[in-house]
């Protein structure tokens, strides 16, 4: 896999940046690490009017993204449990806060399609998490 660290961020340009860049091909290769998928009919239902998102996009872009988000959710939950056990908070009924994903962009760029697609794919993750969409209007209300 071809991983490229981002531009150095220190004064002497020796330490790589905090992010990595992957080609679409390298990212798509990560799709094999998950079996989560949707069929064409479901994708048709999710897509917005005139939205170009293809099943190939789902496989090459959204499946690896879903798996990565799933890993973050799982390990965030494990950290919550371990922290509560260490701090002896389990007896106080501390509840885990939701894992929130924000999607931003200009008007009519596909934010709703991305949100619906992630909701569908994440809902098919191994632990079958509850996934809700909260629109800006619903959030502000």
Question: For the regions a protein language model found, what residue spans apply to each?
Answer:
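Hydrophobic, Leu/Ile/Phe/Ala-enriched alpha-helical segments that form helix-helix packing faces
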Residues: 69-73, 118-126
């Amino acid at each position: 896999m071809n991983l490229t660290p981002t531009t150095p961020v220190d004064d002497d340009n020796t330490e790589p940046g905090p992010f990595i860049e992957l080609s679409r091909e390298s990212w798509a290769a990560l799709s094999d690490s998950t079996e989560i998928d949707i069929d064409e009919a479901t994708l048709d239902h999710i897509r917005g009017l005139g939205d170009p998102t293809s099943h190939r996009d789902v496989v090459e872009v959204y499946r690896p993204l879903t798996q990565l988000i799933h890993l973050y959710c799982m390990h965030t939950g494990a950290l919550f449990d371990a922290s509560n056990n260490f701090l002896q908070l389990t007896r106080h009924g501390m509840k885990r806060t939701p894992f929130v994903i924000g999607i931003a962009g200009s008007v009519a760029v596909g934010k709703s399609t991305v949100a619906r697609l992630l909701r569908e794919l994440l809902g098919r993750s191994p632990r079958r998490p509850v996934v809700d969409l909260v629109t800006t209007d619903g959030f502000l209300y």
